Amino acid sequence: MTDTTLLDLLSDSKEFATRHNGSGAAQQKKMLETIGVQSIEQLIDQTVPAAIRLPEKMKLAEPQSESMTLASLKAIAEKNIVNRSFIGQGYYNTLLPNVILRNVLENPGWYTAYTPYQPEISQGRLESLLNYQQMVMDLTAMEIANASLLDEATAAAESMTLCKRAGKSKSLAFFVADGIHPQTVDVVRTRAEFFGYEIISGSMEDLDNHDLFGALLQYPSTTGNIQDLTAIIEKAHAKKTLVSVASDLLALTLLKAPGEMGADIVIGSAQRFGIPMGFGGPHAGFMATKEKFKRTMPGRIIGVSKDSKGKPALRMAMQTREQHIRREKATSNICTAQALLANMSAFYALYHGPEGLRKIARRVHHLTAILVAGLRSEGFELANQHFFDTITLNSNEHSKAIYHRALAEGMNLRKFPTPDNMPVQLGISLDETTTITDVEDLLRVITGKALSSAGFAAQVAEDEFAGIPATCRRRSKYLTHPIFNEHHSETQMMRYMKKLENKDYSLTHGMIPLGCCTMKLNAAALMLPVSWPEFSQMHPFAPTEQSFGYQELAEKLSKMLCEVTGYDGFSLQPNSGAQGEYAGLIAIHRYHQSNGEDQRNICLIPSSAHGTNPATASMLSMKVVVVGCDQQGNIDHADLKAKIDKHRDNLSCIMVTYPSTHGIYEEGIQEICEWVHEAGGQVYLDGANMNAQIGLTSPGFIGSDVSHLNLHKTFCIPHGGGGPGMGPIGVKKHLIPFLPGHIEVTESADNKHYAVSAAELGSASILPISYAYIAMMGEQGLTSATQIAILNANYIMERLRPHYPILYQGKEGRVAHECIIDIRPLEAASGISNEDIAKRLMDYGFHAPTMSFPVGGTFMIEPTESESTAELDRFCDAMIAIRHEIKQIEDGEWSATDNPLVNAPHTQVDLMESEWTHGYSRELACFPSKHSKDSKYWPTVNRVDNVFGDRNLICSCPSIESYMEE
């Protein structure tokens, strides 16, 4: 053996893949034997159609070790220059309390959980999200709030469509007042274009001169100005115009709330509550509105219900509004939002409490007032006479020199766009990290003099709130609920967060076999760079020469994704898969426009498609035409051909998922692409199931034109209990000119660019996760992950086949990376539904698979490559044991109304009941398996009453009395 060979043998460069993939050679051999094949290659040959197999391996760099990857990422990060940021414009430096950093952001108990569709095992983060809603409702003085949106700009666009749905005006005009953040205007204009809305801009005082269905105001404005909106809103209402106000939660601790001025909707970002800027995200957007608009409000809403024992329990309310149910009639296409960030912001509010938040706001305002006093003493004029934390200097001949002098001193000011050779206005925003030294440095840089702040501080102290109009000063109380007034020591905070975490099921407890969700490992090494200051503290609108690190990261990741997908270009802007779909369909629409074919607005969608597909198509005012599926779950080719022929002249695109949502690799997918292309249409291939493609096939090779990727599925960004997500889109060469742009970076004299997110790179600070994953896995590791995901799904199918009907299989009797088992025959025989089985799985220590999608009365099971054979067996053993329990009901051994399934889940309180009246034992109820005795996860409530929750909607924190009742 040569030294080189020995070194290769001892190398740790491929170690990450062996840790990410859950099964080794011996385990794989056992699974292959169960399936009945000799090798994993034979299984893949039987599963993936030969026509779509890649002819050669992906050209990716050799895998790197964890230490090498982190070192290379650190080198990239260090190319970012993190100046002191005074840019503002919706993004501010924050101080994330270490107790939240350590116990939430860096805690897999929080970041690996899934969206709380199973409320009995999600009470912790449901409570935290309810706190978030209460926080937003209190600060905005509105009646109901959601539990989050993707960012402030998206929230503004959603508020526009809410105004149209909820209002009585027949107008198609929407007013965007001067003073809105430019990136918000960009996203709103994009959304308006495809609904056929006219955007009218101007001074808010002119609002009532127009016939409008809605208006968007900013308070405080982007220049920092503050004015009472009451009279303006009253005039708008007199003309049946609904008003949305974009606001700042920290400012609202001192300023009169928009709800008190009559606002119909209040939107914004919770970023200021402890969330790093992260070059644009992720951050939780918020929306609050009036009770009467609750059923047309977008986003997930947490509500208070009760469980089967009558005790208070939380759940996601009014889910029938969501895209997976309402499809093209949904209020929005958004699925993943920003749950993890919303939780962090809520904890920030709890930790500081109302007095602590007000103290932070007072300090920020006080420092701003000192800065203003110093500038005025030297004759500088402000564009805004009133302010909270932001001021705008009127243009003068020294403005450019001041801007560059600040840059030289490591300070970023905001430069307002002005015509060439004209003086620029400068914006300055302070935040909770600003010190008196920073203020003195700003005064010196701007005035050219070393001014002492002491005299100005004394002057300001005489009238602390002189910068805020008397009519705009907050007098109402907020955050009065006990939950915001109890957890101010680190010990209390740590224990409260742990209490909530302990209520929830996450990947720290066991596999989460949700089909179409890809709940794989989020390795610790991947998460580390997220909180590095070089990534986390960058302002998204910092000068380009300061963000070379992010630019390099984006370029390298885009090239990796192009290689993996077979596409030619990528945009990393979309903040979620749904937003990626939206951007992809816009690219298709713009492409048709460029060819003079505006009439192409028909979108073909298979009946099995995820609900986001028709919901997104509707956002572009496309006409959705549904294509049927055959009994095997495949797209009905005859029906597809007929509808292509019928709509040939107006066909825009087809949206397909591959492998299909039925969990199989459909034969003939390339022919489908060809038929659509022959008719002049484009192919949108939904990337939700990309985990079954990498290294074996690719969207580009199959023949599609555009796809979004769920980086929070396939590429290891954690789900976070419902966000953050990332949904970048890849396109073929002809669609590259139609990818999203951004007003801050895109040169577009004809204003034809469009934006779907507030920042150019969306949630940029989590991009290192996917970069590191690909770098550490390499071609072989990624391909192996795909193969093992397919192996695991087929192993589960074979183990469950004798006990449950398998609904769909491919040509050779195989499934892709997920399989669907049919519960309907069992329900017909026993009365036991898939919901009963889902709740019983909790007693066995599992999260349920996906319920009733894509077919009602079924389970879709996706194990992912990260699970060991032992974990797969534990799940299969649980499902088989449950089948035996169902048999006892069928045989009459247990009553149909009193058995372990209909009473599931069982709690610790159930175990300790003084009288046990059921026809089965306590042990069977609570400890049905050996594993449940060794390591028991306990649901904290009994089955939640969904109907009661929607009929008696409560979306605020319960009273202290209800907590005592628990």
Curated annotation (Swiss-Prot):
Its cofactor is pyridoxal 5'-phosphate. Its EC number is 1.4.4.2. InterPro entries: GcvP, GDC-P_C, GDC-P_N, GDC_P, PyrdxlP-dep_Trfase, PyrdxlP-dep_Trfase_major, PyrdxlP-dep_Trfase_small. Keywords: Oxidoreductase, Pyridoxal phosphate. GO terms for molecular function: glycine binding; glycine dehydrogenase (decarboxylating) activity; pyridoxal phosphate binding. The keyword Lipid metabolism does not apply. One of its GO terms (cellular component) is cytosol. The keyword Ubl conjugation does not apply. It catalyses: N(6)-[(R)-lipoyl]-L-lysyl-[glycine-cleavage complex H protein] + glycine + H(+) = N(6)-[(R)-S(8)-aminomethyldihydrolipoyl]-L-lysyl-[glycine-cleavage complex H protein] + CO2. Gene3D superfamilies: Aspartate Aminotransferase, domain 1 (3.90.1150.10), Type I PLP-dependent aspartate aminotransferase-like (Major domain) (3.40.640.10). GO terms for biological process: glycine decarboxylation via glycine cleavage system. It is an enzyme of class 1 (oxidoreductase). The modification N6-(pyridoxal phosphate)lysine is found at K713. The glycine cleavage system is composed of four proteins: P, T, L and H. PANTHER family: GLYCINE DEHYDROGENASE (DECARBOXYLATING), MITOCHONDRIAL, GLYCINE DEHYDROGENASE, DECARBOXYLATING. The glycine cleavage system catalyzes the degradation of glycine. The P protein binds the alpha-amino group of glycine through its pyridoxal phosphate cofactor; CO(2) is released and the remaining methylamine moiety is then transferred to the lipoamide cofactor of the H protein. Belongs to the GcvP family. This is Glycine dehydrogenase (decarboxylating).
